[in-house]
């Protein structure tokens, strides 16, 4: 039995007057991408069951650069020899591009700060990210120190960082985080940050990063946005401060925290690919960037080859990307439902017919092609829940067959029956096989061996039939070639049907292209049967379709 009485609200709203209206609430979308800092190689790596090897970290680092990250936290060099060695590999091997800045993490502890500067020596550019925890819980339970004592830890750390930055050659930027910010009183967090800023003395030309992390997610996202806006308005040197956010996902709202924080004044986001990180993970860089992209905002990150990024990530981290992960999961564009498939197929057709550049396709928020996914393999998926629209779409996209709507419906029943009985999803190839087996070029028990036409009293057809192994030649007249053949078959067999539907189209391009024909027949008892035929001769294709429809009775 769960006991909710042991919990309470653990966050601290900003000290504002009742009725105060925050400016961020007047905005409805992000207009410009923030600066991005990948923390995959630190926060992400430290949370892996098996941390990445040196070679794996190098491969991941190269991928982050290819995606477009300009700031990359490469580790906590004082924490382990692997992290130290990795940083030196980047520096000594000249693997830091001119437009990329590496970031290193250090606690506000004397020997760790000194070790960090040793590790980063010679880097063309580096962000020294120092931090200490400021939350009520950490002050009382972990450090057992007063507010003044905790603030002094931050100030002493800042003084040493500034001193060492003058002793070591290098192009350094600085970042300070009041760790566990979400469990800290906002006014106290600002007090500590301002004390650090007074030491560092940033300028517009040499700004400092103040990072307000969601170390543990403790509130609804709008509370965090309120805290960000209030702190932004009360920080000193505001024109010389880059306000950063670092959300975790404990309550499942990491993306919302980051998005609302940007609306509230955050200029920078620290994040991980696919939400990797401690506990429930850091905020997902992919979701954040693609959300902006879907609103027409260039995120400045390139996920145009999502399958390759996913494959590299899974191989190097040994983590699995959940199938429903936004934008990246295997099933995020997949439609199994018949009504969804029908709407998507019609949306795709509308886009093609109207040469529409703007993406408005139902059920699919971004064009799968933009991130390296395909319509045929990723969008329309066939199982027992699928409908005629999706099944027809699969045949058309993969094999060029554009079935009449009623024929799609007939095929749909057959496909759904097969999927239902086999309890599995069907591939495009399996759908094609069902179509061919059921409707295409069926030649038993009736087959037309040959047909000759003359224009006498309309069209006269002389048809050689094979019915159950018995050949017969019959002549009949019709309004057209197919009508004449249909009349000949009825005359020879005593069958009664009406040619209800006929359509055709080219399957290929060029002078030797194949044609596909579709025939629907209505019989005396009211039933309707369908057939399809293909041939380089459009007349032959039509006759094959007619024969297939008859044989489906």
Which positions does each model-derived feature cover?
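A mid-to-C-terminal "edge-of-domain" accessory segment
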Residues: 2-42, 296-475, 511-514
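Short, small-residue-enriched loops and turns at beta-alpha junctions
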Residues: 43, 47, 77-81, 135-137, ...
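Catalytic alpha/beta core domains of metabolic enzymes, predominantly
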Residues: 219-352
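Mixed-charge, glycine-accented linear interaction segment located at domain edges/termini
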Residues: 527-530, 534-553
């Amino acid at each position: 039995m769960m006991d909710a009485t042991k919990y309470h609200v653990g966050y601290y709203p900003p000290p504002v007057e009742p009725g105060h209206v925050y400016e961020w609430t007047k905005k409805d979308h992000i207009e410009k991408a923030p600066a991005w800092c990948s923390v995959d190689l630190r926060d992400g790596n430290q949370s892996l069951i098996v941390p990445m090897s040196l070679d794996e970290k190098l491969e991941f680092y190269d991928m982050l650069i290819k995606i477009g990250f300009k700031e990359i936290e490469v580790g906590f060099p004082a924490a382990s020899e692997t992290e130290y060695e990795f940083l030196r590999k980047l520096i000594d091997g000249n693997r830091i591009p001119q437009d990329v800045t590496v970031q290193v993490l250090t606690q506000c502890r004397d020997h760790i700060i000194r070790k960090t500067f040793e590790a980063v020596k010679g880097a063309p550019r580096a962000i020294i990210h120092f931090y200490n925890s400021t939350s009520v819980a950490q002050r009382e339970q972990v450090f057992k120190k007063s507010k003044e004592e905790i603030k002094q830890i931050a100030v002493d750390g800042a003084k040493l960082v500034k001193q060492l930055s003058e002793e070591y050659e290098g192009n350094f930027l600085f970042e300070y985080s009041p760790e566990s910010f979400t469990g800290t009183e906002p006014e106290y967090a600002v007090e500590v940050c301002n004390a650090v800023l007074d030491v560092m003395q940033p300028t517009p030309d040499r700004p400092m990063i103040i990072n307000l992390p969601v170390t543990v997610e403790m509130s609804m996202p709008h509370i965090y946005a309120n805290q960000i806006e209030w702190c932004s308005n009360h920080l000193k040197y505001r024109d010389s401060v880059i306000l950063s956010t670092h959300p975790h996902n404990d309550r499942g709202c990491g993306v919302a925290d980051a998005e609302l924080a940007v609306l509230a004044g955050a200029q920078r986001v620290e994040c991980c690919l696919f939400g990797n990180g401690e506990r429930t993970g850091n905020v997902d860089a992919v979701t954040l960037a693609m959300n902006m992209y879907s609103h027409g905002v260039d995120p400045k990150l390139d996920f145009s080859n999502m399958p390759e990024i996913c494959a590299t990530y899974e191989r190097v981290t040994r983590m699995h990307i959940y199938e429903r992960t936004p934008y990246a999961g295997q099933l995020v564009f997949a439609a199994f439902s018949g009504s969804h498939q029908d709407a998507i197929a019609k949306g795709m057709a509308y886009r093609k017919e109207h040469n529409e550049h703007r993406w408005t396709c139902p059920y699919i928020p971004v064009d799968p092609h933009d991130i390296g996914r395909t319509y045929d393999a990723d969008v329309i998926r066939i199982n027992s829940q699928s409908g005629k629209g999706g099944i027809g779409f699969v045949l058309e996209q993969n094999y060029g067959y554009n079935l009449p709507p009623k024929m799609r419906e007939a095929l749909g029943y057959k496909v759904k029956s097969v999927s239902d009985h086999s309890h599995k999803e069907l591939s495009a190839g399996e759908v094609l096989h069902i179509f061919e087996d059921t409707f295409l070029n069926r030649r038993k028990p009736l087959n037309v061996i040959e047909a000759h036409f003359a224009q006498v009293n309309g069209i006269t057809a002389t048809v050689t039939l094979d019915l159950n192994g018995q050949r017969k030649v019959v002549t009949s007249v019709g309004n057209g070639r197919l009508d004449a053949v249909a009349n000949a078959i009825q005359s020879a067999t005593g069958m009664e049907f009406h040619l209800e539907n006929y359509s055709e189209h080219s399957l290929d391009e060029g002078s030797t292209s194949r044609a596909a024909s579709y025939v629907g027949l209505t019989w005396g008892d009211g039933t309707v049967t369908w057939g399809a035929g293909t041939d380089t001769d459009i007349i032959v294709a039509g006759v094959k379709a007619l024969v297939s429809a008859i044989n489906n009775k």
